[in-house]
Amino acid sequence: MRTSIHAQTIYVFAFLLGFCSIVYELLLGQSLSAFLGNTVLRFSVTIGLYMLSMGIGALLAEGRWLEHAAATLLKVEILLTVVGGFSVIFLLIMNSVGIPDTLFSVLAHLLIVLIGVLTGLEIPLLIELRGHEVEGCERTVLGVDYLGAFCGTIAFAFVFYPRFGLIPTTFFVGLLNAFVGVCLYTQRFKVHEAGRRNYAALVGVQAFFFVVLAVLVQTANRVNELFLRYSLAS
């Protein structure tokens, strides 16, 4: 029974992480389109870089990365929570201070690559936690992750962007990402004795960002108004 629950939890994680990652990329694509124009170019390059970076991340997932899969995945989720959850705010600040368009574009595309690489690491780590010996593990985790990504694109197009806008959506998806990170601790994955203290510290960091983003979600409209006022004033 425990094995079954554990398996279902891994699949839920895969779905949610696939959902979060694609929404991060769509947020960045839309932000680039809004700031620099040429929507087709921005989204094409964003998705292309995202897929390439995912492949790089998957290739990096070997050796010591997989040896301590639970701790490594938690580190990945912390990074994704921070990079993805604050990506739009970062771009808004960079645009507000008036940096050149070329530098702005480089910074935005670095975010795209970083999120893609981290996303590419997630699947091998989830498969490692699920266990290679389980028949059909790899294809099920992949399938559920892709389903999550599909649902993310639909949610972004029909719910998040038209109803809430970029900033509230970024905070919410970052919060969802942080929630998955915190939930990793509740599953009691096998952690090496020497790494337990470090693992507990990582959970604390993830919990901190969860609280921060929960507050930001509640105040997202106010934050949005502040940025609009600043943009109009400048």
Show the residue positions of the predicted features.
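Alpha-helical transmembrane segments of multi-pass membrane proteins
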Residues: 1-234
